[in-house]
UniProtKB/Swiss-Prot annotation:
Keyword annotations from UniProtKB, A to Z: DNA-binding, Metal-binding, Nucleus, Transcription, Transcription regulation, Zinc, Zinc-finger
Summary of subunit composition and partner proteins: Interacts with OBF4 or OBF5.
GO terms, molecular function: DNA binding; DNA-binding transcription factor activity; transcription cis-regulatory region binding; zinc ion binding
Stated induction or repression of this protein's expression: By auxin and salicylic acid (SA).
Organism: Arabidopsis thaliana
Protein name (record): Dof zinc finger protein DOF3.4
Role played: Transcription factor that binds specifically to a 5'-AA[AG]G-3' consensus core sequence. Enhances the DNA binding of OBF transcription factors to OCS elements.
């Protein structure tokens, strides 16, 4: 190993091309320019440039280039472990914020009432909301729905001669007449056909006239030509009793 004039051994630095260069004094332990600590070490040369030796301070865990400009990095920055701690703290803070949002100062969120207009239009029939449907314009859902069904059914009965919606009052929720004639408490169905009639309504014949169609007992029809027992009505329609459903008689031939 080559020695210096003073007799001390000298370390040799190897270039990438194989040329040996003696290590200068810049590779020795230099004080840290940030914290003035002597616990430093030489790391490498920037881009293999011997004029830019790179050093590392073990005290403040920062790199610097001897003779270069120090970056504006705060002294005493955190390591990876501290970064993990900060990430955990951020998660806990976000969870606490979400808890505050879900429970705003311990006061439960109040439900917003559903507002309906004072009048609603359905199939050309105007229904005016009264005080019995609800308090003010904030109506209870059950009351407004019930009144809408009842008024719509009554208006359709006055327009077409029979109900144009299916009555579901037999379900026990107070929505008017239902399927009670089906013998299990559901009431008579009312289908949206203009030529359909109940036991006391009228049907439109082929000549444009009106005639009464009596309805027999549930699910019973007697002769094909009997108007009283169901079957063919005036030779043109086949009626299912108590369901007020008519189909062309020619379809059964």
């Amino acid at each position: 190993m080559p020695t210096s004039d003073s007799g001390e051994p000298r370390r040799i630095a190897m270039k990438p091309n194989g040329v040996t260069v003696p290590i200068s004094d810049q590779q020795e332990q230099l004080p840290c320019p940030r914290c003035d600590s002597s616990n430093t070490k030489f790391c490498y040369y920037n881009n293999y440039n011997f004029s830019q030796p790179r050093h590392f301070c073990k005290a403040c865990r920062r790199y610097w280039t001897h003779g270069g400009t120090l970056r504006d990095v705060p002294v005493g920055g955190g390591t990876r472990k501290s970064a993990k701690r900060s990430r955990t703290c951020s998660n806990s803070s976000s969870s606490s914020v979400s808890g505050v949002v879900s429970n705003s100062n311990g006061v439960p969120l109040q439900t917003t009432p559903v507002l309906f207009p004072q009048s609603s239009i359905s199939n050309g029939v105007t229904h005016t909301v009264t005080e019995s449907d609800g308090k003010g314009s904030a109506l209870s859902l059950c009351g407004s729905f019930t009144s809408t069904l009842l008024n719509h059914n009554a208006a359709a009965t006055a327009t077409h001669g029979s109900g144009s919606v299916i009555g579901i009052g037999g379900f026990g929720i107070g929505l008017g007449s239902g399927f009670d004639d089906v013998s299990f408490g559901l009431g008579r169905a009312m289908w949206p056909f203009s030529t359909v009639g109940t036991a006391t309504t009228t049907n439109v014949g082929s000549n444009g006239g009106h005639h009464a169609v009596p309805m027999p007992a549930t699910w019973q029809f007697e002769g094909l030509e009997s108007n009283a027992g169901g079957g063919f009505v005036s030779g043109e329609y086949f009626a299912w009793p108590d369901l007020s459903i008519t189909t062309p008689g020619n379809s059964l031939k």
